[in-house]
Design a protein with these regions (language model features):
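Surface-exposed, active-site-proximal loop segments in enzymatic domains
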Residues: 1, 24-30, 173-175
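Substrate-binding cleft of secreted/luminal carbohydrate-active enzymes
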Residues: 85-98, 120-202
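Aromatic- and acid-rich polysaccharide-binding/catalytic face
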Residues: 9-27, 73-101, 161-167
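Alpha-helix boundary/N-cap detector
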Residues: 28, 32-39, 65-68, 105, ...
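Acidic (Asp/Glu)-rich catalytic clusters
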Residues: 2-12, 41-49, 74-82, 108-118, ...
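Distinct, well-ordered alpha-helical segments
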Residues: 2-3, 63-78, 99-111, 135-145
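Aromatic-lined carbohydrate-recognition surfaces of secreted/lumenal glycan-active proteins
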Residues: 1, 16-19, 44-71, 84-93, ...
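A substrate-binding/cap region within the structured catalytic cores of diverse enzymes
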Residues: 7, 11-32, 41-43, 49, ...
Length: 202
């Protein structure tokens, strides 16, 4: 497998996530997909001991049921002798800002539930509008996300900044001059903003 080949080349895989395993399907197929995810996570755990394994999911973002699928997933993995470490929520900030199917309060509800299952919670930080518009718009949208957490002094265990849109159009350099916003610059400024807001959180 590709994972085994990576290990043979000396690559250490610290994190591995199943992408949209239970959300990129019709609602009536979610239960069967959860069962498949349970098998996959258990199998991955055997091949990657020491690797933190989890799920990237968008069911809350789509306004679909998520609590029972998450509970079923975690219980199934543990019952099968495997381990699951995190759930990362795929939720562009535009979706949360709109408040239609998901909101920032809903995201915090998901976070609390994931913690109640004994897992770490992560938020994928991206902007659909910004990613389709410009590097600068993506930067500004993503940099506004920490403000949603500063006032109540809480934040997810993991923030994951990514884009599958045309913007940012470049990844480097992180020290790009004023008016340029490659992905690494956005990530660095985001991390600094978090460090200033939460100095005791590593």
């Amino acid at each position: 497998s590709r994972i085994q080949k990576m290990s043979e080349y000396g690559v250490t895989v610290s994190y591995a996530a199943l992408q949209s395993e239970i959300s990129k399907c019709p609602p009536e197929e979610v239960s069967a997909r959860v069962d498949q995810a349970i098998r996959d996570i258990i199998e991955f755990g055997k091949k990657m001991p020491g690797t933190k394994i989890g799920l990237i999911d968008a069911n809350p973002t789509k306004g679909r049921p998520w609590q029972e699928p998450y509970r079923h997933l975690v219980q199934g993995v543990r019952a099968g002798g495997g381990h699951i470490d995190f759930i990362h929520l795929d939720c562009p900030c535009d979706a949360a800002n709109s408040g239609r199917r998901v909101s920032w309060e809903k995201i915090k509800e998901v976070e609390r539930f994931v913690h109640s299952l004994g897992l770490h919670f992560g938020l994928i930080c991206t902007s659909a509008d910004g990613g389709k518009t410009s590097d600068e718009r993506f930067y500004k949208d993503v940099m506004a996300i920490p403000e949603r957490y500063v006032k109540d002094r809480t934040c997810p265990d993991h923030f994951i900044i990514m884009s599958w849109y045309p913007h940012p159009s470049r990844s480097l350099p992180e020290n790009a001059p004023e008016g340029q916003y490659p992905m690494t610059k956005t990530s660095l400024h985001f991390a600094r903003k978090l460090a200033n807001a939460f100095p005791n959180k590593s």
